[in-house]
Regions:
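Serine-esterase "nucleophile elbow" of acetyl-processing enzymes
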Residues: 1-52, 57, 63-71
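Alpha-helical cap/lid subdomain in secreted, periplasmic
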Residues: 38-43, 61-184
């Protein structure tokens, strides 16, 4: 994990601030966020700062080491898939640690939009939704976006933009970003 931390810290020296950051675990580390943002011609940076071995115990330290200095506009939290045993053993501790992470992010960056992203477990997703609601964050269930056709959407978006149509949006379109990241 130390190698990954060092890599992210070096990348952060060149990274733009005020973007979208995916903070996930496991296979999330393989999502090429910046390349997908470039391919879909997003006009804001999207970074993947996910870790193998990320858990609720080390999440705050990893956030501080690799994300805090990016001053992200939005953080996508995709944490919980590897926590089923912990959740089953102590649901209250799971909830407290997740809420502590969210509160820490809000303390470090008061303007940061935090999105709790669903995992592939209905029981934990119910808890994640509760956590998101109780901390005034967004919860997005990505299970319904698995059938999305990214190439078709990219073609339509490109066509609409070449026609001169620009949509007004004062925040980054989270649902679209999640579709891009989790269905590539």
């Amino acid at each position: 994990m130390e190698t990954q931390i060092k890599k992210y810290q070096e990348l952060n020296d060149f990274a733009l601030k005020n973007g979208v950051v995916l903070f996930g675990e496991g296979i999330d580390t393989d999502i090429p966020a910046s390349e997908l943002a470039q391919s879909f011609e997003l006009d804001y940076p999207v970074y993947n700062r996910s870790f193998l071995g990320l858990n609720l115990e080390n999440s705050i330290a990893l956030y501080d080491s690799c994300i805090k200095n990016l001053m992200p506009d939005t953080v996508l939290l995709h944490i919980g898939a590897s926590h089923l045993d912990f959740f089953n053993e102590n649901k209250v501790a799971f909830e407290q640690k997740y809420i502590s992470l969210i509160e820490h992010i809000k303390t470090m960056n008061k303007k940061c939009r935090i999105v709790v992203v669903s995992i592939d477990n209905k029981t934990i997703n119910q808890e994640l939704k509760y956590i998101a609601d109780s901390t005034k964050c967004e919860f997005v269930d990505i299970s319904s976006i698995k059938v999305w056709n990214p190439q078709a959407t990219k073609n339509v978006t490109t066509f609409v933009q070449t026609m001169g149509v620009r949509k007004y949006c004062n925040r980054k379109p989270i649902y679209d970003i999640l579709k891009i990241l989790f269905t590539y």
